[in-house]
């Protein structure tokens, strides 16, 4: 599919390096440097998931860790499944496979979406704390469907085949956030002779300077 919502130039992506990825069984194209969210938006994908309880359609709302809607399942095989990954924080790579965590038979045509139209009357806030209490022996059955309605991702049922790097290190000053303020604070602390570690959720430093 063409990237119908992609600007012809600008941004910090490499348009010479095209990457293929799959979302909900449909193959799309993006560029190196895209986040998964950016690539989905560029391809005109606006429904990413469904809301809790009422199953109303939800799209990408934010740009980072604060994203409330685009929480996806990542992984091409059972062993590599990663639940609850925010599309705004996931870098695009060749062969990435992502799926919505709810919506049946699919996220665009969710049968539970009817609750979004009548749910306010039939399901007032907190109704499940009263409705599903009896008989007590049925709770495990109720719980299975309530969890599915919550839209939570699932953990893999096979062992993770990947290995991970780790490091134990010590410092005098830990600075969280590598934007302009964090970098300035780190420079000042380092000039005083302190051992400084800068931690940031992004792949590179700079924040709003980039």
Where are the language model's segments positioned?
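Signature of N-terminal electron-transfer/Fe-S-associated modules in redox systems
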Residues: 1-152, 160, 169
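N-terminal glycine-rich anion-binding loops that anchor highly charged ligand groups
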Residues: 13-15, 198-203
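Conserved active-site and cofactor/substrate-binding residues in soluble primary-metabolism enzymes
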Residues: 31, 35, 184, 191, ...
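N-terminal Rossmann-like FAD-binding beta1-loop-alpha1 element of flavoenzymes
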Residues: 167-198
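Conserved N-terminal glycine-rich FAD pyrophosphate-binding loop of Rossmann-like flavoproteins
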Residues: 203-210
